Amino acid sequence: MLLTMNLQLFAHKKGGGSTSNGRDSESKRLGAKSADGQTVTGGSILYRQRGTKIYPGVNVGIGGDDTLFAKVDGVVRFERKGRDKKQVSVYPVAN
């Protein structure tokens, strides 16, 4: 009669978990800050991003960290730019 043994090895030191775990970066709050159709003032941040995920359109500037901002007061419009790109524009509203 042949006996088979099931031998399982487990960690014998578990105390290092609190040291090796427990690191997470703070969220960067990226993304849209103004919605399509929303009225904004000049200088308002429209979209925070890393790289040019969305391109600047009419009356929209781009900051050093690729943040898109309104250059004039107006209404925000998210539009397609070509086949696979997006852009955001701000169109002034006639009083």
UniProtKB/Swiss-Prot annotation:
SUPFAM superfamilies: Ribosomal L27 protein-like. The keyword Ribosomal protein applies. GO terms for molecular function: structural constituent of ribosome. It comes from the Bacteria. Residues 12-38 are annotated as: Disordered. Pfam families: Ribosomal_L27. GO terms for cellular component: cytosolic large ribosomal subunit. The N-terminus is cleaved by ribosomal processing cysteine protease Prp. GO terms for biological process: translation. Belongs to the bacterial ribosomal protein bL27 family. This is Large ribosomal subunit protein bL27.
